[in-house]
Swiss-Prot record:
Keywords: ATP-binding, Cell inner membrane, Cell membrane, Membrane, Nucleotide-binding, Translocase, Transport. It comes from Xanthomonas axonopodis pv. citri (strain 306). This is Aliphatic sulfonates import ATP-binding protein SsuB 1. ATP binds at residues 38-45. Its EC number is 7.6.2.14. It catalyses: ATP + H2O + aliphatic sulfonate-[sulfonate-binding protein]Side 1 = ADP + phosphate + aliphatic sulfonateSide 2 + [sulfonate-binding protein]Side 1. Residues 6-234 form the ABC transporter domain. It is found in: Cell inner membrane.
Amino acid sequence: MSSSGLQLHIAGKRFGTRQVLRDIDLQLAPGEIVSLIGASGCGKSTLLRILAGLERDYAGEVALDGARVRGVDRQIGFIFQEPRLLPWLDVAANVAFADEADLSPAAARQSARVQQLLAQVGLLDYATALPKQLSGGQAQRVALARGLYRQPRVLLLDEPFSAVDAFTRIKLQDLLLRLAGEHGFSVLLVTHDIDEAVYLSDRVIVIGGQPGTIAHAQRLELPRPRDRQAHEAALRQARQDLLAALHSLHVF
């Protein structure tokens, strides 16, 4: 296994007497986008929490460029399924809160880093808005900006677009691809949407079994930047191949 990028080895993870993950070996290359799919309860979100340093009671290790990661690391960002914005802070302060909790809202609005990120997610005019004034898609854009504030090398996302409508989901998917291309970070995404996994990813990994392990991995030889119309046939074929693999594995 190469020492470049993010490496994960999980010999086992238990909750009480129940083993939820076993024999997981996963590497995420610099700039690579990988999706994790699998049935509910197979351990996908637990795997992300281990990588994020939020779950430490497991047998195995996480490493970045060969150096072991212990606990929460500023080089690894995490985007939750829900935006989880602080309701008493405006948009700018929520973005800066990722690393500068003591920064005043006024100072956050003047921060060049905050302004850059809000411009990149299309919310520069919403810097003074409170979370209750945002749509679901706008709130998740703020969460993306907050996740990038520390300039992570790896971004973990746990079903980040599942709570928004289909049109907003498409826009957020394209935004994620654009941000990943501009910033050069790697992405590990948990999703139940096969079309989303195929469109976004360089690889799709299927977690299956009880306890969960890597049941299948499929590399997607599709060019970047992705284009839904120009690559429609290739995306459709990749989806069919993945569905065939899932049916043969009886994962869902």
